[in-house]
C-alpha cells in the first residue's frame, strides 16, 4: 500500500514539508488507543534469534533507523514501533541552529536517492535531553556534531558539551565529522585532529565511568562510534583503522552521505549537498568490507547507505557489518522493509 498509494501522494509535495507532516501524522495516529499494538503487529518480528550483543549493548534486532530522521528525539518511541531494533537521534549540536537556507532537501526519484544540505538543523542538545528523559526501553544512539559558527580549532568543546549533556540518556554515541553540509567539518576526519577529538571524548568517558562507580550506580563507559564518509581513500580508511585501535573507540558507522554524483540521472543531481540512497549502496558496502578485512574484524561496524531491499542489507552484513541502519530506503520503500530484512536475516541464519 505504501509504494502504490501513500508514496506517490507524498512525493507530490516538498520533501521537507512532507517530513514534518509525516512526523505529525505518526504522532497523532500513535495516540489513538490500540494503534501502537497494530503497528507492532504489522512491522515487528519478535524472535530471540534476531538479538545481537554489540559493543556491550543488547539489540532486539540488528536493523536500526539512522540519524537525521528524528534529529531532536521527538518521535523515537513511535518510530520504534515500526520494528527497528534501535533509533539514532541527531545530529545534535550544543546550541540550536536553523541549518542551511531552504530549499535544502531534494528527491532524485530516477535514482532512488536524496540530496540534502540541511546543515545540522536542530533545537539544541538540551531540548533533546528533556525528551529523552521520558524514554522507557528504546535503545538510543546519540549522534553529535559541532555548531556551524564554531571554528574547527574549538570543535572539541562542542562535542564535549553534547557528550556531557546526553551521557545519561543515550546508549551509545556517534561522533559525526563526515557530513558535507557544515563548512570544513570533514577536515576533522584527518588523522591528527580526529585522534585528538576522540581521545578527549574517551578520557571524559573513562572519567565518567569512575565517577559512576564511586556513586550509587555503576553503568560503565558508553560506546563511542565514529561515522565516516564514503569518499575516503583506501589510505584514509587505513588511517581510520589505526585511529580506532589507538583511541579504543567502540566501532565505526559506514557510511555517511557522499559528495559524488557519478551515474546520476535526475535533474536534481546538480544540487549541492550529501547524496544518500541507492547510488551509495555499493560504495558503502565496499567500505564496510575493506574495514572489516583490513582490521581483521577488530571492531564492530554499523552498515548504512543505500539499503533499499533485503539483498542490500544481507550484503552489508556479509561484508562485515554487525548492525545496519536505514534512512532513504525507509522513505522510498516504506516501513515494510524493516520486517522483510529481519525475516530474511532469520531465514539465512545470519
Curated annotation (Swiss-Prot):
Q: Where does substrate bind?
A: 71, 116-120, 176, 181, 256-257
GO MF entries: dihydroorotate dehydrogenase (quinone) activity
Q: Under what name is this protein listed?
A: Dihydroorotate dehydrogenase (quinone)
**Localisation:** Cell membrane
The active site is formed by 179 (nucleophile)
| Membrane topology reported for the UniProt record | Peripheral membrane protein
Q: Corresponding gene?
A: pyrD
Which EC number(s) does the record attach to this protein? 1.3.5.2
